[in-house]
């Protein structure tokens, strides 16, 4: 049975993604029955960061800065022929 081909394809794509605005895949661990993807550690996800910063919604410059970084990450993915169908702040 092994690892599904979709998982292998996603892992190979994630290994190629090297950009400041994309969380990096650090390692892949394959045990007997499970496959573990080890990603770069981040203190907070975007949603928690936005919720913990009341000034976020009040400062248009801050919103633009975050949006710019998100769009740079998406543009990088698109330039490598990768589409992300599940973007969310978590």
Swiss-Prot record:
Instruction: Give the matching PROSITE patterns.
Output: PROTEIN_KINASE_DOM
Tissue-wise expression: Differentially expressed in leaves, protoplasts.
Is Magnesium one of the keywords?
no
One GO CC annotation: cyclin-dependent protein kinase holoenzyme complex
InterPro entries in the cross-refs: CDK (IPR050108), Kinase-like_dom_sf (IPR011009), Prot_kinase_dom (IPR000719)
* One annotated GO molecular function: cyclin-dependent protein serine/threonine kinase activity
The reactions it catalyses are: L-seryl-[protein] + ATP = O-phospho-L-seryl-[protein] + ADP + H(+); L-threonyl-[protein] + ATP = O-phospho-L-threonyl-[protein] + ADP + H(+); [DNA-directed RNA polymerase] + ATP = phospho-[DNA-directed RNA polymerase] + ADP + H(+)
Keyword set for this entry?
ATP-binding, Cell cycle, Cell division, Kinase, Mitosis, Nucleotide-binding, Phosphoprotein, Serine/threonine-protein kinase, Transferase
Q: Which segments constitute the Protein kinase domain?
A: 1-90
Summary of activators and inhibitors of this protein = Phosphorylation inactivates the enzyme.
Cleavable signal peptide: none
Residue spans making up a coiled coil are none
Biological process (GO) annotations held by this record are: cell division; G1/S transition of mitotic cell cycle; regulation of G2/M transition of mitotic cell cycle; regulation of meiotic cell cycle; signal transduction
The UniProt entry annotates the active site at 86 (proton acceptor)
One Pfam family, short name: Pkinase
Q: Does the keyword Heme apply?
A: no
> Known EC number(s)?
2.7.11.22, 2.7.11.23
The record's family statement is:
Belongs to the protein kinase superfamily. CMGC Ser/Thr protein kinase family. CDC2/CDKX subfamily.
The record's function comment reads:
Plays a key role in the control of the eukaryotic cell cycle. Component of the kinase complex that phosphorylates the repetitive C-terminus of RNA polymerase II.
What is the official name of this protein in its record?
A: Cell division control protein 2 homolog
Organism this protein belongs to = Petunia hybrida (Petunia)
List the top taxonomic levels of the source. Answer: Eukaryota, Viridiplantae, Streptophyta, Embryophyta, Tracheophyta
Gene that encodes the chain: CDC2
